[in-house]
Amino acid sequence: MPWHDDSSMTDDPTTPTRSRVIGVDVAGTGVFLVALIIAVPFRSERFAQFLIGGVSMLLFAIGMATTLWAYARALERSRTEEVGVANLYLLTGPTAPKPVRRILTWALAIQVVAAVVGAWIGVVGLDKGELNALAFGVLVPMFGIGMNGVWAALHGSYGPRVGRAVSPTDHEMD
């Protein structure tokens, strides 16, 4: 289905522009930002280190799982559709309608910027041998990449496959 006409979209949460994936991505980004905002002023305290480390590792784990799931789903779709990695994880080309691409790209950009700024703030004022727990935030953008992949695997619009789809049984073993 081409994404040129948004008038066909309804308020149903299963439609591409109202997908729950978008809500999960925005919520995960919000959780990370709140954890970072709490952890920055208390970066030397153990509770803040566990908070930012735990949230970052949880979002990273979710991102890894969703990235792998999206890749497996995209492999299935690639038998009949021209699916590219950039289309899948960065929503390039006609993969997603502009509102979806805007939200998911902004969420990923916010994750990247917040992670880098948090890691940089964590370095400031560290004594030798101290832990920069805020640096765990650099793991979080994997969550955004995974959410992009899930959305694109479920709802993405791809062109028809240009070449003949190759089945694993079409190859002979030498």
Which residue ranges define each predicted feature?
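Cytosolic-side membrane-entry/anchor segment at the start of a transmembrane helix
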Residues: M1-V34, V150-D174
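Select subsegments of transmembrane alpha-helices in polytopic membrane proteins
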Residues: R20-V31, K98-Q111
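Alpha-helical transmembrane segments and their membrane-interface junctions
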Residues: V34-F42, T105-G137
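Short, hydrophobic transmembrane alpha-helix segments
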Residues: V40-F50
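Alpha-helical transmembrane segments
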Residues: Q49-W69
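Membrane-water interface of transmembrane alpha-helices
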Residues: M64-A86
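Short membrane-interface loop/juxtamembrane segments of multi-pass integral membrane proteins
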Residues: V83-I103
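Alpha-helical membrane-embedded segments
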Residues: F136-A152
